[in-house]
C-alpha cells in the first residue's frame, strides 16, 4: 500500500521492466512444466512408482507434448509479453498477439490479431497485462468459452485479470 508507506516515510519505487526477463523465463518454465508434465513425472519418481513396473521407463502419460508447432497467444506485448513472444519463436511456435497499445513495428513474425481470434486459435494463452479497469476479469466466462477445450492458460499478470471463480467452474 503506497499511501501506508508514504505516511511512514518509506520510499516506494516502481522499477518498471526490471524483472521482464525473469517473468518471461518463468512463463516458459510454467509452460514446459505443464506440457512436458514435469511435475507429474517428478511425483511419480519420488513416490517410487517406477520401481513397481517391469520397465524403468516413465509411462506414456508422463511424456507430455512439445512446444514446437503449438500456437501461443500472448495477451499484452509490453516488455514481458514481447520477450515471451521472442522465446516462443526459439521453440518453433506460432505466435499470436493481442495488445491494442503496442507499437505497430513489433516483430514481423508475430501475428497481431483481435482478442477473440487469439483466444479461439491459441493452444496456450499467456497474460502479460497490467491490472486496470479494462483488464480486470478480462478472462471471464465469455473469453474462456472462446478457447480451445484443451488450451492452457498461464497468468503471470495480476491475479484479478482472470475471474478465478469462473475459471474454477470452467475447469470442473
Q: Which residues are covered by each model-predicted region?
A:
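Short beta->alpha connector loops at strand-helix junctions that form conserved
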Residues: 9-21, 99, 157
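An N-terminal-biased, well-structured beta-alpha scaffold segment characteristic
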Residues: 1-15, 120, 140
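Glycine-rich Rossmann-fold phosphate-binding loop(s) that bind the pyrophosphate
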Residues: 77-78
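Phosphate-binding beta-alpha-beta segment of Rossmann-like dinucleotide-binding domains, i.e.
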Residues: 16-71
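A short helix->loop->beta-strand "cap" motif at the edges of active sites that frequently abuts
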Residues: 7-11, 93, 149-151
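N-terminal Rossmann-fold NAD(P) dinucleotide-binding loop
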Residues: 81-82
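Residues at the starts of beta-strands that form the adenosine-phosphate
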Residues: 85, 93-94
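Rossmann-like adenosine-cofactor binding region
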Residues: 96, 100-172
Amino acid at each position: 500500500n503506497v499511501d501506508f508507506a508514504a505516511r511512514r516515510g518509506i520510499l516506494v519505487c516502481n522499477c518498471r521492466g526490471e524483472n521482464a526477463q525473469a517473468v518471461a523465463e518463468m512463463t516458459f518454465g510454467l509452460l514446459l512444466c505443464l506440457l512436458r508434465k514435469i511435475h507429474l513425472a517428478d511425483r511419480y519418481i519420488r513416490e517410487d512408482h517406477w520401481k513397481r513396473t517391469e520397465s524403468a521407463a516413465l509411462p506414456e502419460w508422463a511424456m507430455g507434448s512439445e512446444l514446437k508447432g503449438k500456437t501461443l497467444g500472448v495477451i499484452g506485448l509490453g516488455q514481458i509479453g514481447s520477450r515471451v513472444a521472442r522465446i516462443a519463436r526459439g521453440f518453433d511456435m506460432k505466435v499470436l498477439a493481442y495488445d491494442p497499445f503496442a507499437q505497430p513495428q513489433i516483430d514481423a513474425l508475430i501475428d497481431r490479431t483481435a482478442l477473440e481470434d487469439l483466444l479461439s486459435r491459441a493452444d496456450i494463452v499467456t497474460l502479460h497485462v497490467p491490472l486496470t479497469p479494462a483488464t480486470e476479469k478480462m478472462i471471464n466466462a465469455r473469453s474462456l468459452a472462446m478457447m480451445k477445450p484443451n488450451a492452457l492458460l498461464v497468468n503471470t499478470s495480476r491475479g484479478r485479470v482472470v475471474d478465478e471463480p469462473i475459471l474454477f467452474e470452467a475447469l470442473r
